Amino acid sequence: MGLLSILRKLKSAPDQEVRILLLGLDNAGKTTLLKQLASEDISHITPTQGFNIKSVQSQGFKLNVWDIGGQRKIRPYWRSYFENTDILIYVIDSADRKRFEETGQELTELLEEEKLSCVPVLIFANKQDLLTAAPASEIAEGLNLHTIRDRVWQIQSCSALTGEGVQDGMNWVCKNVNAKKK
């Protein structure tokens, strides 16, 4: 088999499908992040009442991103989406310090869910474009992320609005798709 036929075969190989669950409190920036990933207009975003799904091609993967609303009344339904999740992305509003405790409790509960057991988790410390935003290191310390031992995880500073840090986080996602610990 010649080099050209090998390259053709590689090029025609279908992208590996990856199911990504995008969670976080209401107003954390999940939908803005999703639209940023899909290179869509982010000028008019309304609170997600149910869910949004977008497929994004990245580094040989077809990333199927499920953005689930974060309002308190919707959160009990999050568990309906846990099945077959390959990566969990949890978005935090870094500028809303009054809700750090609440967001920490939600994240802790997610990490204890059996259906999300060992699923790699990327925490986006969003809204870093705001002057009041806490740095990712402060959030990591406040949420005791260093105690996570049953999975690979990463915290990434970002601004879904400007796009800063988003690609770095998605690079981590693509590198860790197959890191689900058994």
Swiss-Prot record:
Annotated consequence of substituting D168A: Reduces the interaction with RP2
Organism superkingdom: Eukaryota
PANTHER family, per database record: ADP-RIBOSYLATION FACTOR-LIKE PROTEIN 2-RELATED
Binding sites annotated in the UniProt record for GTP: 24-31, 48, 67-71, 126-129, 159-161
Subcellular location: Golgi apparatus membrane; Cytoplasm, Cytoskeleton, Spindle; Nucleus; Cytoplasm, Cytoskeleton, Microtubule organizing center, Centrosome
Gene3D superfamilies: P-loop containing nucleotide triphosphate hydrolases (3.40.50.300)
Consequence of substituting Q71L: Inhibits RP2-dependent GTP-hydrolysis rate
Listed InterPro entries: ARL2/3, P-loop_NTPase, Small_GTP-bd, Small_GTPase_ARF/SAR
Result of altering E164A: Reduces the interaction with RP2
Name assigned to this protein: ADP-ribosylation factor-like protein 3
Residues the entry annotates as binding Mg(2+): T31, T48
Gene that encodes the chain: Arl3
UniProt function note: Small GTP-binding protein which cycles between an inactive GDP-bound and an active GTP-bound form, and the rate of cycling is regulated by guanine nucleotide exchange factors (GEF) and GTPase-activating proteins (GAP). Required for normal cytokinesis and cilia signaling. Required for targeting proteins to the cilium, including myristoylated NPHP3 and prenylated INPP5E. Targets NPHP3 to the ciliary membrane by releasing myristoylated NPHP3 from UNC119B cargo adapter into the cilium.
Knockout-associated phenotype: Lethality by 3 weeks of age. Mice exhibit abnormal development of renal, hepatic, and pancreatic epithelial tubule structures. Mice show abnormal epithelial cell proliferation and cyst formation. Moreover, they exhibit photoreceptor degeneration as early as postnatal day 14.
